[in-house]
Amino acid sequence: MRTYELMAVFSAHEDLFLQGSTAVRALLQENDAVIAREDHIGERELAYPLKKQKRGRYLLFIVQCEPGKVRELDHKLRLRHDLLTHLFVRVDS
């Protein structure tokens, strides 16, 4: 298994953030990814509007999963309407 950082940006609305972050955690666990750490970075103004939102809540996950699962997770995360954007980055050991 490799280690990855997943930066996820959710809507600034509290209820949408809680719903979305719970769904992302569940999605990671369903796909055999182990969440090593989770950091709530906070709410920030976006550099440019995403899905008509000017502010977003950032959540950083450090996950361990098989390399083949990242593409599948990326595709499933793109389909989530409550997630403004996300980025997977492989962490070098």
From Swiss-Prot:
It comes from the Bacteria. The keyword rRNA-binding applies. The keyword RNA-binding applies. Pfam families: Ribosomal_S6 (PF01250). Keywords: Ribonucleoprotein, Ribosomal protein, RNA-binding, rRNA-binding. GO terms for cellular component: cytoplasm; ribonucleoprotein complex; ribosome. One of its GO terms (biological process) is translation. GO terms for molecular function: small ribosomal subunit rRNA binding; structural constituent of ribosome. InterPro entries: Ribosomal_bS6, Ribosomal_bS6_sf, Ribosomal_S6_plastid/chlpt, Transl_elong_EF1B/ribsomal_bS6. Binds together with bS18 to 16S ribosomal RNA. Belongs to the bacterial ribosomal protein bS6 family. HAMAP family: Ribosomal_bS6. This is Small ribosomal subunit protein bS6. The gene is rpsF.
